[in-house]
Swiss-Prot record:
Protein name: Leucine aminopeptidase 1
Keywords associated with the record: Aminopeptidase, Disulfide bond, Glycoprotein, Hydrolase, Metal-binding, Protease, Secreted, Signal, Zinc, Zymogen
Sites carrying sugar chains: 111, 184, 304
Cofactor(s) the record lists: Zn(2+)
Record note on cofactor: Binds 2 Zn(2+) ions per subunit.
Species: Neurospora crassa (strain ATCC 24698 / 74-OR23-1A / CBS 708.71 / DSM 1257 / FGSC 987)
Residues that bind Zn(2+) 1: 192, 211, 277
Pro-piece positions: 19-92
Gene Ontology annotations for the cellular component aspect, listed alphabetically: extracellular region
Length: 402
């Protein structure tokens, strides 16, 4: 069956544009007179894991078809060994019984800025796509690294705090910013920087405002304000804090798998990992008559870390949380979990009310709430600061209420 350009666009573009496409169909307007741009074809096979032990080999087109149907997965083609290097006996994760740093955090929380997040997100979404194999995806990563380094320099922290690319073969690199503490015990805050249009990833625009531009700028803002603490930039805190911006999450958690494979091989002591993926969309929650809240993922996460994050939300956020589920391999925290590290994930809402514009040309800033993103930034900043000063050695020995 031959399909016209206009008919194909009706499938590719947001529903809001469908009326224009229908009119073009009636008038036989050729929107692509030279033909629909073709996605580069590849016969390469990729090994994916859809659930524990459920693997198959697929083409790249089949990967995107699975994603369009809502199926998430690890692409384990190059990372089949993730989770096999850490042979230490299982040790139950332990976290503080309650938040203890509110006095020091209160002045910092007041410095979080919606304007900073909006300015960064406006530029970040101006790249045609942040698809991890694209040139604009590479450029967006370079731009983001510069913002992170500029943030460090503006804080006067460039003698101690570092930011670097974690390089990948596909061109768009992940980014790791490190705030050294007194010990090598590490707390990780993550988001993914790439975007995708699941119809023609190499061709169509993917502004990715919510997925995951919102998470990217949310943790960048938490990072900026965290560096306003003299104790933090002087390294007076116990634990090393890392902020990660992962490449190629949309391709099957590729960037985070590469990083956590390296960490697992090196026996890095990661105490906690929190992922922020989609932090700005609340419309469907409110339309359903539900209370604005943040969504705490409760499947395929560390329950003790998740309970601690709930306490952080209650203590430091102005809105409540709701428990929700997102399935296997639904974001980069899954890579940390697979490596044996306690991980957690907080999203913008109950999963069923999350943003329905993602992976299209219509994932735009106009649908987002920066007030809601501010709540995620408050949680992220408080999480980082509280665990920066946690004495995990004492906690793991069962001493004290730290």
């Amino acid at each position: 069956m031959k399909i016209s350009n206009a008919s194909l666009l009706a499938l590719l573009l947001p529903a809001a544009s469908a009326r224009f496409v229908e009119q073009a169909e009636q008038n036989r307007v050729m929107l692509f007179p030279d033909g629909i741009p073709e996605e580069p074809k590849s016969t390469t096979k990729y090994h994916i894991e859809l659930s524990p032990g459920d693997t198959r080999w697929v083409t790249e087109d089949e990967k995107w078809e699975l994603r369009r149907n809502g199926q998430r997965f690890f692409d384990i083609t190059d990372h089949a060994e993730l989770g096999t290097f850490n042979k230490r006996p299982y040790k139950k994760s332990v976290f503080p019984k309650k938040p203890t740093q509110k006095k020091d955090l209160e002045p910092l929380l007041k410095n979080l800025s919606k304007t900073e997040m909006e300015d960064h997100l406006t530029t970040f979404t101006s790249f045609h796509t942040r698809y991890y194999k694209s040139e604009s995806g590479r450029q967006s990563s370079e731009w983001l690294l510069k913002q992170v380094r500029d943030t460090i320099k503006a804080a006067g922290a460039d003698d101690t705090v570092t930011a670097r690319h974690f390089e990948h073969a596909w061109g768009q690199n992940s980014i790791i910013a490190t705030i050294p503490g007194k010990t090598n015990a590490t707390v990780v805050i993550g988001a993914h920087q790439d975007s995708i249009n699941l119809w023609l990833p190499s061709v169509l625009a993917a502004p990715g405002a919510d997925d995951d531009g919102s998470g990217t700028v949310t943790i960048l803002e938490a990072f900026r304000v965290l560096l306003q603490s003299e104790d933090i930039i002087k390294g007076n805190h116990e634990n090393t804090i890392e902020f990660h911006w992962y490449s190629a999450e949309e391709g099957g958690l590729l960037g985070s798998q590469a990083i956590f494979t390296t960490y697992e091989k090196a026996r890095r002591d990661v105490k906690a990992m929190l992922q922020q993926d989609m932090t700005g969309f609340v419309s469907r929650t409110l339309q359903a008559g539900e209370v604005e809240s943040v969504g705490v993922i409760v499947d395929y996460v560390d329950p003790n870390l998740t309970d601690f994050i709930k306490k952080i939300i209650v203590e430091y956020c102005d809105i409540p949380y709701v428990e929700t589920k997102c399935g296997y391999a639904c974001s980069d925290h899954a890579s940390a979990s697979k490596a044996g590290y306690p991980s957690a994930f907080v999203i913008e809402s109950a999963f069923e009310y999350s943003d329905n514009h993602i992976h299209t040309t219509d994932d735009l800033i106009k649908y987002l709430s920066f007030d809601h993103m501010l709540q995620h930034a408050r949680m992220t900043l408080a999480f980082a600061y509280e665990l920066a000063f946690a004495d995990f050695a004492k906690l793991e020995k069962g001493h004290g209420d730290l």
